[in-house]
């Protein structure tokens, strides 16, 4: 979440108490000695599924897989009130202590540095103990508009084709990091998760002693519905048969750097269970304590803790799908961490006419890489609320999970693919792969193009050579110039997902246009999807 751009969702305030000087610190260790674990026996510290994922991607085990040395955590105890958790990837512990004792921690011979990551702490009674006033820093982008049928958001990225081919994410493990998942137990859209025992893990990192993640903010429920919902006629999402890990990483009341460590802790937990995909509709740049803020020059994929964690997850064979942010009004380089991390998919938002949503953050990263990589419909997709009702919302929070679902179905279809192969296939399927930019990235991905791309050698062509005319339409006849093949599949859909045309069309030569007749087409803006043996394209058509 990000205060600066009013990202993602409304946060409810919690009660505070005054006068408590205990804060939360990250304690980084210099070394990582091990006596109980060996790289030759990874089954001692990783699940079988995690080991299989490493083997599939030919990823060696390394010291990052080892836990923090227990003798270090034991040695700290006289100087702290509590250890909240440790991070093996950061070789650190997040602890509760006061400022004076933090200085004694810094003096320990095995401590590299101590950093304040949050003011105050949570007691096990559930109360927030902090000397700062409550905060409600995030602006809401949730709309009460319920007119958007889910068909459109699915059609845009090829979910119907994926389902028709029999792929619904089965056997793929997806982790969702968010601020809570209320209503999931009661909602019919999620009933199958419990009937089929698809929930493989639950973790509250904010309050590690809490065992109930089906509470707090409904943002996580909204996000989860765009991956997992299966309620025909209401919402059927792309990967409803996927297995899932639900992790509560966001502190509703405040915005401190500890949430980066919460994210990393959840990623380590998910990794240990063998997760395939992480969906994170979260982002960080500015904090309640200005001294913790990052500058845009630090969005280089390696300067923020959370981007380091996301990059490590990617190197472990996990596909991280992250919202690029809702700071589009700020212009270029308005993304947030960890969307800047290398090797992940950062996701922006488009409107129902496939143009960039005004709120969608833009790249590039500080080191010049294209961001976002891909986009999906984020300006009003249909989703499920915590009360089980259908709704619609806007934000890159809601475009990212749609692509996480697409990735899960594609990985089910191609189980031998490495994470890198999956990433490349999704990117190459983008509607503007040949001419990427820092607004739409490589464009809108598509299941059919990603699935067949490996076999058919999909590559981009100059989008400027793709033309539909007359546009706006002046008659029922429309001509399309696209690619060099003699046959193309043409699909025409409206913003509600209704399909008006879906046929194979032929032409006599590669220089001739494809000709189609669109009878009884109502007035409006339509999206034409084009598929041949080499590429996929997306064009807009206007009917006055």
Language model features with spans:
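Hydrolase catalytic cores
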Residues: 227, 247-251, 334, 378-440
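Catalytic-core environment of secreted peptidases
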Residues: 188-200, 352-397
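Subtilisin-like serine protease catalytic core
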Residues: 22, 39, 160-259, 273-276, ...
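C-terminal subdomain of the subtilisin-like protease fold in secreted/lumenal serine endopeptidases
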Residues: 151, 275-279, 412-471
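Substrate-binding/access-modulating region of protease and related hydrolase catalytic domains
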Residues: 163, 230-233, 247-340, 366-369, ...
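C-terminal outer-membrane/trafficking sorting elements
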Residues: 462-469, 473-544
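Primarily auto-inhibitory N-terminal propeptides
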Residues: 22-82, 101-103, 112-124
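Autoinhibitory propeptides
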Residues: 71-154, 162-163, 342
């Amino acid at each position: 979440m990000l205060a600066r751009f009013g990202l993602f969702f409304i946060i409810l305030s919690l009660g505070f108490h005054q006068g408590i000087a205990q804060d939360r610190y990250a304690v980084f260790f210099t070394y990582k000695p091990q006596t109980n674990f060996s790289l030759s026996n990874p089954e001692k510290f990783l699940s079988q599924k995690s080991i299989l994922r490493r083997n599939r991607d030919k990823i060696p085990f390394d010291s990052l897989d080892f836990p923090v040395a227990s003798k270090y955590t034991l040695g700290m105890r006289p100087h702290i009130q509590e250890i909240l958790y440790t991070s093996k990837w950061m070789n650190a512990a997040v602890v509760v202590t006061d400022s004076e004792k933090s200085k004694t921690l810094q003096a320990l011979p095995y401590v590299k540095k101590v950093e304040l990551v949050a003011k105050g702490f949570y007691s096990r009674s559930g109360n927030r103990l902090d000397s700062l006033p409550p905060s409600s820093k995030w602006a809401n982008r949730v709309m009460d508009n319920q007119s958007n049928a889910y068909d459109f958001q699915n059609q845009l990225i090829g979910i119907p084709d994926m389902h028709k081919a029999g792929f619904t994410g089965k056997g793929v493990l997806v982790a969702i990091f968010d601020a809570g998942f209320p209503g999931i137990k009661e909602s019919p859209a999620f009933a199958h998760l419990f009937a089929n025992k698809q929930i493989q893990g639950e973790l509250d990192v904010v309050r590690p002693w809490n065992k109930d993640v089906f509470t707090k903010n409904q943002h996580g429920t909204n996000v989860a519905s765009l991956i997992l919902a299966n309620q025909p006629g209401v919402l059927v999402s792309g990967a409803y048969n996927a297995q899932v890990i639900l992790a509560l990483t966001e502190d509703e009341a405040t915005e401190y750097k500890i949430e980066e460590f919460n994210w990393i802790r959840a990623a380590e937990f998910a990794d240990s269970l063998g997760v395939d995909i992480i969906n994170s509709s979260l982002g960080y740049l500015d904090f309640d304590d200005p001294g913790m803020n990052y500058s845009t020059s630090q969005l280089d994929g390696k300067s923020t803790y959370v981007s380091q964690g996301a990059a490590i997850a990617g190197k472990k064979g996990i596909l991280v799908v992250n919202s690029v942010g809702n700071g589009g009004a700020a212009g270029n380089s308005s993304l947030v961490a960890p969307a800047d991390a290398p090797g992940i998919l950062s996701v922006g938002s488009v409107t129902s006419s496939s143009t960039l949503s005004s709120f969608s953050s833009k790249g590039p990263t500080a080191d010049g890489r294209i961001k976002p990589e891909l986009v999906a419909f984020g300006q009003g997709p249909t989703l499920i609320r915590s009360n089980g009702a259908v709704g619609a919302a806007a934000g890159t929070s809601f475009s990212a999970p749609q692509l996480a679902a697409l990735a899960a179905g594609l990985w089910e279809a191609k189980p031998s693919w490495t994470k890198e192969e999956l990433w490349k296939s999704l990117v190459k399927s983008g509607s503007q792969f040949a001419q990427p930019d820092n607004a739409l990235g490589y464009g809108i991905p598509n299941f059919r193009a990603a699935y067949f791309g490996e076999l058919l050698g999909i590559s981009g062509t100059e989008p400027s050579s793709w033309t539909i005319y007359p546009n706006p339409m002046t008659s029922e006849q429309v001509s399309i110039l696209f690619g060099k093949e003699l046959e193309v599949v043409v699909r025409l859909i409206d913003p509600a997902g209704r399909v008006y045309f879906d046929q194979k069309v032929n032409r006599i030569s590669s220089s001739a246009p494809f000709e189609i007749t669109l009878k009884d087409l109502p007035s409006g803006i339509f999206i034409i999807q084009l598929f041949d043996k080499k590429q996929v394209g997306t064009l807009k058509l206007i009917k006055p």
